[in-house]
């Protein structure tokens, strides 16, 4: 059984490969031609399933459903003081207008972080309770499966550290005085929302692996 990841995010690919050792794992571009997936779900779970199902459909078109499963991750940060923003729009936060609609495709890690900082500062806050959510979805010839992982802490109004991506430099996990951007990879791998979700998803993968010839 081989796994193709339903993402073009190289940072996510690296992190997932580090956790799921012992599997033959491929980035999306290594198996199928890149194609656009419209993530129009209202939850992390819905969007994760949209991605894993879309990729598995491509695998079926190529006659690879007996060889591969698809695995996707949909994750994001929710800040209490911002009413749960950016949430499922974490990767597209800069492009999110005041009416909750995504306009344009200009969002990147840097301007997403800058927007979150400006939102906190507008409320005269230096920090707010926040949490990360990760939903891992697996699609296979046997069906679809999901698992969730969470990490709690606080979002702050200044960037600290350069080790990581996304909002890592703005998030201090509970029990630590450093941001994810300041922590080493080994520590992050132990506590991250994605790792917790992958730990549960690994039970599914082990079970599926037994059913592949």
From Swiss-Prot:
Binding site for substrate: 7-12, 75, 165-168, 188, 193-194
Enzyme class of the recorded protein, top EC level: hydrolase
SUPFAM superfamilies documented for this protein: ITPase-like (SSF52972)
Stretches assigned to coiled coil: none
Catalytic activity of the protein: XTP + H2O = XMP + diphosphate + H(+); dITP + H2O = dIMP + diphosphate + H(+); ITP + H2O = IMP + diphosphate + H(+)
Protein name: dITP/XTP pyrophosphatase
Gene Ontology annotations for the cellular component aspect, listed alphabetically: cytosol
Residues that hold Mg(2+) according to the record: 74
InterPro entries registered for this protein in UniProt: dITP/XTP_pyrophosphatase, ITPase-like_fam, RdgB/HAM1
Location of the active site: 74 (proton acceptor)
Family classification: Belongs to the HAM1 NTPase family.
Organism: Campylobacter concisus (strain 13826)
Enzyme Commission numbers on file: 3.6.1.66
Record-level Gene Ontology MF annotations: dITP diphosphatase activity; ITP diphosphatase activity; metal ion binding; nucleotide binding; ribonucleoside triphosphate phosphatase activity; XTP diphosphatase activity
Alphabetical GO biological process terms: nucleotide metabolic process; purine nucleoside triphosphate catabolic process
Gene3D superfamilies listed in its UniProt record: 3.90.950.10
Keywords, in A-Z order: Hydrolase, Magnesium, Metal-binding, Nucleotide metabolism, Nucleotide-binding
Obligatory cofactor(s): Mg(2+)
Pfam family, one: Ham1p_like
